[in-house]
UniProtKB/Swiss-Prot annotation:
CDD domains recorded: ZIP_TSC22D
PROSITE patterns, per database record: TSC22
A single GO BP: regulation of transcription by RNA polymerase II
Family listed: Belongs to the TSC-22/Dip/Bun family.
One Pfam family of this chain: TSC22
Protein's name in the database: Protein tsct-1
Disulfide bond positions: none
Signal peptide: none
Length: 269
């Protein structure tokens, strides 16, 4: 019983020390009132670059290693041109343009650049949960897309745009198709939706695990407290019985025996 109490106290000290050392950032909605109770969970900073399973996650809020992200897809294999501007990486790939009936014949060998840009709004610390502050880089080898960040200024400069806006904190993604294959647009929308659903599922799993741990700890502490209360009650009853027995003995014992007990108190104890 005492070993469990000491272990629980040690765990409590470690948890409180960790929470004091980490710099905590509270997530407060813009329309929140001052007297509104604080949220159950708080946001803590994570490393700018870390791995989760077989995925490598890079946080680009502070302009870290965005321009050094693995050179994917390889230029020598897919013959692609990688350009970076305004925190956006755009990958171009040439493929034959479909033949159309026009006044002047167009050769089938002519090629045109097709650029597809994934546009994502810059997350705000006070509105977006911690898992949504880390941008997810979607890599599509078929359509050659490696983009992230705020692409408002870049999208206006591209001749043939294929824009996809993915907001992971609200309703499903809205896809605007200006030119291109509808099948590819549908596949990209499914990919973005699946990614968003995966992030939400991971968040739910983490919350459920934390709730389960909290529930187990709460029940364990309550059980230990009840055991301690029962032990204290038994000891108090035993103490009262001994006091009553001592009082009766003092009243009925002879003065000689009482004097002998008082003189040899240490031996009796």
């Amino acid at each position: 019983m005492f070993i469990f109490a000491a272990a629980f106290q040690q765990n409590t000290i470690i948890m409180s020390t960790t929470s004091n050392e980490a710099s905590v950032i509270e997530v407060v909605p813009p329309n929140a009132n001052c007297d509104k109770p604080k949220k159950k969970f708080q946001v803590v900073p994570v490393p700018g670059e870390f791995t989760r399973g077989r995925w490598k996650v890079i946080d680009t809020r502070f302009g870290s290693a965005m321009g050094e992200f693995g050179n994917y897809p390889p230029e020598d294999e897919y013959k692609m041109i990688v350009t970076s501007k305004n925190n956006v990486i755009t990958v171009r790939k040439k493929f034959p343009r479909p033949t159309t009936v026009t006044s002047a014949p167009i050769l089938g060998a002519e090629e045109a650049d097709s650029i597809r840009v994934l546009q994502k709004s810059q997350p705000r610390f006070e509105q977006v949960p911690v898992t949504n502050q880390i941008k997810i880089l979607i890599m599509d080898p078929e359509t050659a897309v490696v983009t992230a960040g705020n692409t408002g200024s870049t999208a206006s400069e591209v001749g043939t745009d294929f824009a996809l806006t993915n907001d992971m904190t609200s309703s499903p993604s809205s896809v605007a198709l200006l030119s291109g294959d509808p099948t590819k647009m549908e596949d990209s929308a499914k990919l973005a939706t699946a990614t968003s659903n995966t992030v939400v599922a991971i968040d739910n799993k983490i919350v459920q695990a934390m709730d389960l741990v909290k529930t187990h700890l709460t029940f364990a502490v309550r059980e230990e407290v009840e055991t301690l209360r029962t032990t204290i009650t038994d000891l108090e009853a035993r103490l009262n019985a001994l006091r009553e027995e001592n009082r009766l003995l003092r009243e009925n014992v002879s003065p000689e025996v009482l004097a002998f007990i008082t003189a040899n108190k240490q031996l009796c104890e």
